[in-house]
Structure formats: structure tokens, C-alpha cells
Amino acid sequence: MKLGELAAHLGCPVEGNPDVEIRGLASIQQAGPGELSFIESEKYARFIKLTRAEALILDWRTPVSKVPCIRSEQPRLTFAHALELFYQPRRPAPGIHPTAILGANVQLGENVHLGAYVVIGDDVTIGPEAVIYPNCTIYNDVRIGVRTVVHANCVLHERTKIGDECIVQSGAVVGGEGFGFVPTPEGTWHKMPQSGYVRVEDQVEIGSNAAIDRPSVGFTHIGRGTKIDNLVMVGHGCEIGEHCLLVGQVGLAGGVKLGRNVVLAGQVGVAGHAAIGDRTVVSAQSGIPSDVEPGTVVSGSPALPHALWLRTSALIRRLPELFQNLRDLQRKVALLQQRLDSGHH
């Protein structure tokens, strides 16, 4: 595809030769002849001189280079759209593999694919054009929506409801028993029955080896368009709003509530029943012990407003120096006190 044709598909203008041929896409460091890449802002303009890419996607502020370019307000998003034109994941053909095992009253929509060794319980409904890859286990009473893809080795526990156009990556477990135990007078732990379920709305993505638990009663809810990374733990009874982003190794204790468009960076931990408001951003490795107001950016453990955390972190790095200064001052004060005392006598 010529660069000009690609730009027309993307709805963006071209600077430079529109007739260069684009055969693929790659990162700025790895791109070579015939490949398109991007940089997100002028902050990374130094890579333009080093790249061997045939053409680039640039924002309007990045200086014009000798490399032909497509101009965009959002280069990363435009690159994603370009990638969709070149890369179409191969979908398996509709059908049921002969090794798949289906329980009673299973309802399959049109053009469903069930891979090898898939095991499906009773009273399961799978929507049209859904794809279930090999070795998945789907318990009783599960509902899976239209065009949802469940990758290999996933487990969907009883009563789980997955919406339309979701993606569940390999190894994820959705709807497993919540971690519910009640202390007894004898000092033991009594298991609380976990009779609830997990409800996942449309266009949610769940990463590899993520775990989303069901509660004792009611349901755990994942809002529409939310993206959950690998190794994320969502505890029983959590309520996650629409279009949230949970990055790798985030852990939510039971009953946590997230508003809309909340971003939790890697390894964030949230204490039980804490509520995090809409559009909040939590920096990596932060600990959230209690509620967070909407629209804030917090960092640290326990989490503080980001600006305060930056100042605190700067002071922490200076603590050895400040401590030594304090010791020096203490010694000087002690010497002054001795001289004063000697003068009085």
C-alpha cells in the first residue's frame, strides 16, 4: 500500500513523497525499509535521525524530517488504526472439535468455534461467532456473548456472564470462589459459601492469568470497555466502572468500587471496600487504604496526592543528610550549653 493511500484510509495528511510503498509496521527502533513507524511527541524526535523506517506518523509539533510522514493529533492512536489495516488476527473456522465435551441444554449461536478438549457444563449459552480455544473449561449456567473470544486454558466458573465482543486471554479464571472465611470462637475459619457470580459487560478484555472472584451473595461487576492486564486479582464483590484500566499485578480486595475511567498502574493494591472516584489515576506500586476523590492523581503507600508524594520522596532521599545535620546541630547546641553553664559558675 502506498503511503498516500494509507493516509487517506486514516483521514490524515501526508508530508513528503506519498508514493513510497508501505509493506508493514514496526517500532521506531526496529523499523526498516518498507515499514511505517511512529513517535508520540517531539520528546522522542531524536529517534527520527536514527530510524531506518520508510515513513513515520508524527504529531504536528515534531519538526519535519527527511522521512515522509503522516501528520496526526494522536500518533499512537493513528498507528493503532494503521496496524488494524495490516494485521488481521486469524479466526478459526466455525465448528465443534470432535474432542469437545458438551453438557445438557447447551445452546450455541451461529458460527461458534469450540476448540480441542473444550469442556462445557450444563445450561450454558454461547452467542453467535464466539470462539472458545482449546482446553477451556466452562462450568454450568455460564453465558458468553456475541463474538467473544476465550483463549486456551481459561476457566469460567458457574453462573459467570460474559458480554459481547470480550476477550479473555489464556489462563484467566473468572468466577472462582471468593476468599471468604469467618473466624469461629474456637479459633478456626468457617468457609462462607460463595453463591454469587461474576458479570462482565461488553468489550472487556481480561489478561492472562488474571483472577476475578465471585462473592458470597450478589455479583462482582466489570463495567463495559474495561481492560484488565495479566496477573490482576479482582476480589469478591468488586464493582469496576466503565472504561477502567488495571495494569499488571493490580490487586483489589473484596468490595472495592472503582468509578469510570479509573487507571490503576502496575502493582497497585486497594484495601477492602475502598471507593475510588471517576477519572482517578493511581501510580505504580501505590497502596490505597481508603476512599479517593474523583479526578485525582495519587502515589505512594499509603497513597498521597501526587505532588505531595513527589515532595515527600525528595525529602526521604535527603534523610541521611538531614539526620547528620541535625546531629551536628545537637552537638553544637550541647557545646554552647556547656559554655553557658560554665560562665554561670
UniProtKB/Swiss-Prot annotation:
Pathway: Bacterial outer membrane biogenesis; LPS lipid A biosynthesis. Its EC number is 2.3.1.191. It is an enzyme of class 2 (transferase). SUPFAM superfamilies: Trimeric LpxA-like enzymes. It catalyses: a UDP-3-O-[(3R)-3-hydroxyacyl]-alpha-D-glucosamine + a (3R)-hydroxyacyl-[ACP] = a UDP-2-N,3-O-bis[(3R)-3-hydroxyacyl]-alpha-D-glucosamine + holo-[ACP] + H(+). GO terms for cellular component: carboxysome; membrane. Keywords: Acyltransferase, Lipid A biosynthesis, Lipid biosynthesis, Lipid metabolism, Repeat, Transferase. Transmembrane segments: none annotated. The active site is at H236 (proton acceptor). One of its GO terms (biological process) is lipid A biosynthetic process. It comes from the Bacteria. GO terms for molecular function: N-acyltransferase activity; structural constituent of carboxysome shell. Catalyzes the N-acylation of UDP-3-O-acylglucosamine using 3-hydroxyacyl-ACP as the acyl donor. Is involved in the biosynthesis of lipid A, a phosphorylated glycolipid that anchors the lipopolysaccharide to the outer membrane of the cell. Homotrimer. Belongs to the transferase hexapeptide repeat family. LpxD subfamily. This is UDP-3-O-acylglucosamine N-acyltransferase 3.
